[in-house]
Swiss-Prot record:
Organism: Macaca fascicularis (Crab-eating macaque)
Gene that this polypeptide is encoded by: PSMA4
Protein's name in the database: Proteasome subunit alpha type-4
Gene Ontology biological-process annotations: ubiquitin-dependent protein catabolic process
Location in or out of the cell: Cytoplasm; Nucleus
Modified residues (N6-acetyllysine): 127, 176
Main location: cytoplasm
Pfam assignment, any one: Proteasome_A_N
Phosphoserine: residues carrying this PTM: 13, 75, 173
Keyword Cell cycle: no
Cysteines joined through disulfide linkages: none
Highest taxon of the lineage: Eukaryota
Length: 261
């Protein structure tokens, strides 16, 4: 049935659906997991890295996380070549604003500007939508730390914690369960990110080379964006495994005590 209505982006089906936009969303569902968590003292992005090759140079290579300006970074899920075009556009928009107004662009304004472009590509004839969802983290003087998500159709929203990519529904339900509003520090957010990735990634054992993590904090009145080194990620994974083992032991001991009763 859909074949008659999905050859062009601009044709509505009788149910009022745009199939090409839905297919773009489908591409994101097969991409590596990306999640963002907002804490009181910062905000983080954690992403699954699929393209791991021992000959890749880490200094120049970041598969999932991009710095946009001094106050913002983003993570992508979907077609990487589309993501490169959009991140370049984001950087241009941010620099134009800085040149024009002599102050950094507010986070939401940058997200809105890109979403206008994404939405236009769902209307133009002969063009396809961008097959990319983005998570944005940032800080501005108006609203402090912020986390946004945008989709191929041009929709966006502000979040406290969210996930895009493969197994995102399972990840979001875990975040909903474990996110403690008003109590989240960056340290506890990092632990939660590792816990969620460990449960949702399609690997038997989580390893540091398959995970990319970036944090955004404020120090001495300046925004600091850091991509964690592999050793730091290894330590986080090790700590998580120790806590899991401890919880498992306590559970077994509790069960044993109940049996003995």
């Amino acid at each position: 049935m859909s074949r008659r209505y999905d050859s062009r982006t601009t044709i509505f089906s009788p149910e009022g659906r745009l199939y090409q936009v839905e297919y773009a969303m489908e591409a994101i569902g097969h991409a590596g997991t990306c999640l963002g968590i907002l804490a009181n003292d910062g905000v983080l992005l954690a992403a699954e890295r699929r393209n791991i090759h021992k000959l890749l140079d880490e200094v120049f290579f970041s598969e999932k996380i991009y710095k946009l300006n001094e106050d913002m970074a983003c993570s992508v899920a979907g077609i990487t070549s589309d993501a490169n075009v959009l991140t370049n556009e984001l950087r241009l928009i941010a620099q134009r604003y800085l040149l024009q107004y002599q102050e950094p662009i507010p986070c939401e304004q940058l997200v809105t500007a890109l979403c206008d472009i994404k939405q236009a590509y769902t209307q133009f004839g002969g063009k396809r939508p961008f097959g990319v969802s983005l998570l944005y983290i940032g800080w501005d003087k108006h609203y402090g730390f912020q986390l946004y998500q945008s989709d191929p159709n041009g929709n966006y929203g502000g979040w406290k914690a969210t996930c895009i990519g493969n197994n995102s529904a399972a990840a979001v339900s875990m975040l909903k369960q474990d996110y403690k509003e008003g109590e989240m520090t960056l340290k506890s957010a990092l632990a939660l990110a590792i816990k969620v990735l460990n449960k949702t990634m399609d690997v038997s054992k989580l390893s540091a080379e398959k995970v990319e993590i970036a944090t955004l904090t404020r120090e001495n009145g300046k925004t600091v964006i850091r991509v964690l080194k592999q050793k730091e990620v290894e330590q986080l994974i090790k700590k998580h495994e120790e806590e899991e083992a401890k919880a498992e032991r306590e559970k077994k001991e509790k069960e044993q005590k109940e049996k003995d009763k």
